[in-house]
A protein has these predicted regions:
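A cross-family "folded-core" feature that marks the main globular domain of proteins
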Residues: 2-117
């Protein structure tokens, strides 16, 4: 698996043959260069984009959302998949990470969250 694009220190786009893979892991992109072999021991999760739209959205996500929220969302999804014995669409990562960041920001600003139920 070779580095194709580095989003940040914790996320990169890799190529394995003709397959593009989004690789997540603490420090997986740190001191990497395009064309180098991905450090396997740093990989926590791999996503196999179905289309260019997902890769574009993920690129925007990594520039707008802290890695911790992506990591939390990834862990939540992995736990749910294991417990429910199912696979979720990879788009869930993008929406869930964004939602978590927004919820934390509201909480830190002490903005009320009303539940009308």
């Amino acid at each position: 698996m070779l580095v194709k694009k580095i989003f940040n220190n914790n996320v990169l786009l890799a190529e394995d043959g003709d397959q593009e893979i989004v690789v997540i892991g603490r420090g997986v992109g740190f001191q990497q260069k395009i064309g180098q072999v991905v450090a396997q021991q740093k990989i926590e999760k791999c996503y196999y984009p179905k289309d260019q739209r997902w890769t574009t959205l993920f690129n925007e996500l990594t520039s707008a959302i802290a890695f911790e929220y992506i990591e939390i969302a990834s862990h939540i999804i992995a736990t749910a998949e294991a417990r429910l014995d199912t696979d979720f669409d990879d788009y869930l990562l993008i929406g869930l990470a964004d939602h978590i960041q927004f919820a934390v920001a509201r909480q830190l600003k002490a903005l009320p969250i009303k539940n009308e139920l």
